[in-house]
Amino acid sequence: MSTTTLTRREQRAKAQHFIDTLEGTAFPNSKRIYVTGSQHDIRVPMREIQLSPTLIGGSKDNPQFEENEAVPVYDTSGPYGDPEVAINVQQGLAKLRQPWIDARNDSEELDDRSSAYTRERLADDGLDDLRFTGLLTPKRAKAGKRVTQLHYARQGIVTPEMEFIAIRENMGRERIRSEVLRHQHPGMNFGARLPENITPEFVRDEVAAGRAIIPANINHPESEPMIIGRNFLVKVNANIGNSAVTSSIEEEVEKLVWSTRWGADTVMDLSTGRYIHETREWILRNSPVPIGTVPIYQALEKVNGIAEDLTWEAFRDTLLEQAEQGVDYFTIHAGVLLRYVPMTAKRLTGIVSRGGSIMAKWCLSHHKENFLFEHFREICEICAAYDVSLSLGDGLRPGSIQDANDEAQFSELHTLGELTKIAWEYDVQVMIEGPGHVPMHMIQRNMTEELESCHEAPFYTLGPLTTDIAPGYDHFTSGIGAAMIGWFGCAMLCYVTPKEHLGLPNKEDVKQGLITYKIAAHAADLAKGHPGAQIRDNAMSKARFEFRWEDQFNLALDPFTARAYHDETLPQESGKVAHFCSMCGPKFCSMKISQGVRDYAAAQAIEVGMADMSENFRAKGGEIYLKREEA
């Protein structure tokens, strides 16, 4: 771990340099490929890892090789992963989905911003130096129209977004021919439907049933379509955002790009500090992945941080502000009801959700029902006009394993199920947020309860952390729970970084959290038996057995760390072709010994086979030519 501490000025300057010099970058020995759909502008990005050939025989002067197929993998990095694309953060990303949105002809540009706060910010010329220059003119649904992917799915329409997703979820596995790579253990899927080939119609069907969501605000055309549902690959969310204490716009944009590079399928901007509006605009215009927020955080800032002063009007204005910027999903803590708050009194750690505690305090101060619950239908009307998905927040999630699976937690969950049905009346897409802190033996019940109470809407959990004793290592404690609940059917895992419970994560913390959670998500896909999930593992194992070190590095989730660890003890180029590593050395390498055993067994089999043929030759009289039997 680095011991160098940068000043705030140095951190900001470093982030600014990152942004100014940003260009598309591929991982080592990887290249960006695009798979085209039924129309020319459906170009689905993937990363293809190129592999070296296997030595199969021959001589030193004339070696014989067998080619190894390139391995295609899911890629969340957008244009930042393509060296051929010119990157300019000041201009933002290309508007990939704009032609599809326009072609549907069910939305219209607004003459002015609907949010009074947005109009106030735009009128403040003191913010000109902070403001993103290429602001979009926001759109909303035409009168009487709904523009959500759920609405289209229910109408039987397969959108370009759905076709894009079908291609993306298949991960190019149809390109793989090797039986060794295609081999896969049967999984235990706990009732999930995992077709061998995902079609656009299957995507449409899952969205129509509410089992999956496509977060895709019509005001975020830069995003590449993705899907969240238990019958698809398990996804990972990364949280970024400034606070009143630290971080800047430059640093948050840097963290966004960094997150997508290391595999974030979505990113939540949880900013609570200065310039929340401006920071979010920069993030959205440069994000190839869906962006989520917790609007109550900004609404609280608008009333000077005093929860009791929150009003529906201030919150509604915040929803309009963020929807017209392009936020793809809102976390709404509408299930924290007044009657549930006393249930938390006997907890060890009370209410640990920021949004949950804000709403609980408001309810108790006014002795009124949660205004988010009371105005939930109006929230749905706003979301339906922009296609903002709802992530129904678990404001009463347990903050310690002692509080896991208690009355407050599951009471709120049942209310979220009721709210899910209301949202579906408005064709609004919904996912459900989950815990939290839960010991391993109590995790599966969370998934079972969610499926039953929330009608199979996608589950999105923070971990859960399986023990409370490891501050500084909570990416590990939660990664265990994340792998388990992903296996049981959780659709998206919210990452936890090493800084959880300790401080705001920096760039390296973001990477550590993402790598941990990509491992958890992939382990869950393997356990479920998701078709094609084992291809990369098989390729890695084959490279490992054949001592193809470069391929091992390049197939790793983090090639740079894998290479660095190897090179700590064997830095020479000869170490990249050696048939051992520093763990066992040349004499005790189990794989080298296994290769010898295999070669010996093969030679023995040939020798036994030759002996059998010799015996058979003698038994038939030892004649070189046998007489043909007469008919």
Swiss-Prot record:
Reaction(s) the record says it catalyses: 5-amino-1-(5-phospho-beta-D-ribosyl)imidazole + S-adenosyl-L-methionine = 4-amino-2-methyl-5-(phosphooxymethyl)pyrimidine + CO + 5'-deoxyadenosine + formate + L-methionine + 3 H(+)
Binding locations of [4Fe-4S] cluster: C581, C584, C589
UniProt-annotated binding residues for substrate: N239, M268, Y297, H333, S353, R354, G355, D394, G395, L396, R397, E433, Y460
InterPro entries associated with the record: ThiC (IPR037509), ThiC-associated_dom (IPR025747), ThiC/Bza_core_dom (IPR038521), ThiC/BzaA/B (IPR002817)
Keywords: 4Fe-4S, Iron, Iron-sulfur, Lyase, Metal-binding, S-adenosyl-L-methionine, Thiamine biosynthesis, Zinc
Binding site for Zn(2+): H437, H501
Keyword Methyltransferase part of the UniProt annotation: no
Record bears the keyword Iron-sulfur: yes
PANTHER family per record: PHOSPHOMETHYLPYRIMIDINE SYNTHASE, CHLOROPLASTIC, THIAMINE BIOSYNTHESIS PROTEIN THIC
GO biological process: thiamine biosynthetic process; thiamine diphosphate biosynthetic process
Pathway listed: Cofactor biosynthesis; thiamine diphosphate biosynthesis
Co-factor binding details: Binds 1 [4Fe-4S] cluster per subunit. The cluster is coordinated with 3 cysteines and an exchangeable S-adenosyl-L-methionine.
Cofactor: [4Fe-4S] cluster
Record text on subunit structure and interactions: Homodimer.
Family to which the UniProt record says this protein belongs: Belongs to the ThiC family.
Function: Catalyzes the synthesis of the hydroxymethylpyrimidine phosphate (HMP-P) moiety of thiamine from aminoimidazole ribotide (AIR) in a radical S-adenosyl-L-methionine (SAM)-dependent reaction.
GO cellular component: cytosol
UniProt EC number: 4.1.99.17
Gene: thiC
This protein's name: Phosphomethylpyrimidine synthase
One Pfam short name: ThiC-associated
EC top class named in words: lyase
GO terms, molecular function: 4 iron, 4 sulfur cluster binding; carbon-carbon lyase activity; zinc ion binding
